[in-house]
Amino acid sequence: SLSKRQGFAEYWYTFMTTGGDSGTGGGSGITPDIPSGWTLDKPINTSGYIASSYEYKQCTWFTWNRAKDFGITFGMYMGNGADWQKQAGYTVTTTPTIHSAVSFSGGQTVGGQWNADPVYGHVAFVEGIHSDGSVLISQSGTGFSTVYTFQVLTKAQASQLHYVIGK
C-alpha cells in the first residue's frame, strides 16, 4: 500500500542519512545479518518455504514458514499481520515468548524504526530473548531489500506487543 511504501521510504531515508541508526527507538536497526551477540536456534533457509495461502515475501508468509521450521503451526488463513493476535484458538500474551509470532497492530511502531502498515499491521517471528528483556525478531516484507531481516527490540518496546503462541 502507499502508506507502507511511504513508511519504508521514511525509514530508509533516515537510515541512510544518519549512518544506519534512525535514533528513534533504542532497538537495533533492520539488518539482513544476525546482530552481534545473538544466535539462532536453527538457521533460516527459505528455499523450502511455501506460498500457498500467504504471498511470497510478505510478513505472514515468512512467519508462518519460520514457525514450521520449529514444528510450530499456525492456521493457513490467519489474515494480515495485525489479525494474528485476534485469531480464536491461540494463546496471546504480552510477555515475549521464544518462537512465537509477534503481531503488530496497524500503525504500531516496529522497534521505533518504522511503523506497521496502518491497515494490515505486521507480524514477525521471535528468534531469541536476552536476559535484559531485549528480543530478536526475524521478519519479511515487500519493503525490505532482502527476503528476510533481523531487528532487536528493547524490553520496553517488546512489552507493548502481542505474542501469539503457535500449536
Residue ranges and their predicted role:
Residues 17-21, 128:
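Extracellular interdomain linker/stem segments of modular secreted and single-pass surface proteins
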Residues 25-131, 135-140:
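Secreted/periplasmic proteins that engage bacterial cell-wall peptidoglycan
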Residues 9, 136, 146-148:
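Surface-exposed loop/edge segments in extracytoplasmic proteins
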Residues 11-17:
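C-terminal edge beta-strand
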Residues 146-167:
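Intrinsically disordered, low-complexity, charged/polar segments
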Residues 4-10:
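Short, exposed coil/turn segments at beta-strand boundaries within extracellular/luminal domains
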Residues 142-144:
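Short coil/turn motifs at secondary-structure junctions
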